[in-house]
Curated annotation (Swiss-Prot):
This is Uncharacterized protein ycf40. Signal peptide: none annotated. The lineage of its organism: Eukaryota, Rhodophyta, Bangiophyceae, Bangiales, Bangiaceae. CDD domains: Ubl_ThiS. It is found in: Plastid, Chloroplast. It comes from the Eukaryota. Keywords: Chloroplast, Plastid. Its main location: plastid. Belongs to the ycf40 family.
């Protein structure tokens, strides 16, 4: 089996991994609370219910938007 590195962008910054990752695994690895963020992959907004079943592909562009309350 040949291992191919996966190169993606997270908020415009390069990120490499050695195997496909679920979006939820990536969020956990980066220490994001999935209840307080919005995620776009390749300009498509994903609902939170799809975080576990969505896998990151080579050359994907991931935007992680943190939701902050204020007043």
């Amino acid at each position: 089996m040949i291992n191919k590195n996966i190169s993606i962008q997270i908020n415009g910054e390069p990120f490499n991994c050695s195997e496909p990752l679920s979006l939820q695994f990536l969020l956990n690895y980066l220490d994001f609370n999935s209840e307080r963020i919005a995620i776009e992959i390749n300009s498509t907004l994903l609902p939170e219910r799809l975080f576990h079943s969505t896998y990151i592909n080579d050359q994907d562009k991931v935007e992680i938007i943190t939701i902050v309350g204020g007043g």
